[in-house]
C-alpha cells in the first residue's frame, strides 16, 4: 500500500492575490516512473490523496477507504503496473494539504477563514508544482471525476503542452444555477450553525449539525430519482426510529421516520466526523466559481491550445452533471480540433455512478489510456445515428467484447 507523503512547496500565491509562506500538499504515488507513464488522478470534492490500495490504518490522515480502488491499481483500468499514478489532496481541503484547519506558521493557530480563497485554477497550479517537485515534467494523462473533472479541464486549458490525454468523468464546464443554489443552501447550513463562530471553532465544538445538513443536501444531488425510489421508496424506519438522531416536535411523533431520512441522517453524521466545515465552504465555492471559458470568448477558445486526446464519460441518471453538459464539453474539444470521444453510460445511479459502477467506467478509461479515442471499449455520441437515439450504445460489462 502506498503511504501518504507531504511535499513542502514553498511560498504560494493564490489567484485571489493572497499568499501563504509554505504550501503543503499531501500526496500518494503508485507504480514506477519511467519518464513517459505518469497519470495524475484528480479527486472529487471531499476526496483525498488515497485513491487506491484498500483500507488505511485508522491513525492515518484522510479517508479510511481508497475512494477509487476498483479503478486504480495493479491490473485495473488505471494499471499501476504500467503507469506511475499521482494523486494529491487539493489546497483548501483537510486531508493533509494546506487549508483552513492547517496551522498558520506565523500564529501557531489554525488558519480558519483567514486562509486565502482557493480556486480550481489554484489546484492545477499546485499540482503542477508538486509534479516539478517529483521530477515529472510531462503527463501521459490526467483523469478525474466530478469537480475533479473540472480540475482535468483546467489542465487542458492551463497546461495544454504538459499532458497527452485528458479523461473527464461526470463533470461539466461550469455548474448550472440549480446546483449553485443547492450549494449555497448547504453553505448557509454551516454558517448558521452557532458553533461555526465565523470559522473560529478549532479547539471547541465544531459545527457538526450544519456540516451534516450540508452533506445531506449533497447526497440528494448525488442520487437520481430512480435510485432513490429503488433504494428507499416511501418505506418507514418506524415512528420512534428518528428520536435518537435529532430533536423532534411532539406532532412529529404521529408520522413515520422514513428510510430516506434515516439514510441522510446516517450519511450526514458520518461525514461530519471526518471532514472540516470550513474546508467544505472553501471547496464548494471553488467548484461553484469554476468556468472553463473564463478569460476566453468560449469553451472552444479555452481549449484551442490543447493538442492531445479527450474522453468524456457521462451517466444518463446524473442530473448534477448531465449528459448534455458533457456533450457540450465534447463539442468544444471537437471544435478546437481535439480528437474526442464522449462515452455515455446508461445508469440509474445518478452522480454517484462514477464511483459505484467501476465495471462501466473501467473499460473505456482503460482503453483510452492505452489507445486513445480509438480504444475498443470507447464509444462516442452519434447524434445522427440511424436508430434515432441521441447517444450511441455503450459497453455494459467489464468483460464485454
From Swiss-Prot:
GO terms for molecular function: homoserine O-acetyltransferase activity. The active site is at 146 (nucleophile), 318, 351. Pathway: Amino-acid biosynthesis; L-methionine biosynthesis via de novo pathway; O-acetyl-L-homoserine from L-homoserine: step 1/1. GO terms for biological process: homoserine metabolic process; methionine biosynthetic process. GO terms for cellular component: cytoplasm. This is Homoserine O-acetyltransferase. It catalyses: L-homoserine + acetyl-CoA = O-acetyl-L-homoserine + CoA. Pfam families: Abhydrolase_1 (PF00561). Its EC number is 2.3.1.31. The gene is metXA. Its main location: cytoplasm. The keyword Transmembrane helix does not apply. It is an enzyme of class 2 (transferase). It is found in: Cytoplasm. Keywords: Acyltransferase, Amino-acid biosynthesis, Cytoplasm, Methionine biosynthesis, Transferase. Transfers an acetyl group from acetyl-CoA to L-homoserine, forming acetyl-L-homoserine. Belongs to the AB hydrolase superfamily. MetX family. Substrate binds at residues 215, 352. Homodimer. Gene3D superfamilies: alpha/beta hydrolase. It comes from the Archaea. Residues 37-358 form the AB hydrolase-1 domain. Coiled coil: none annotated.
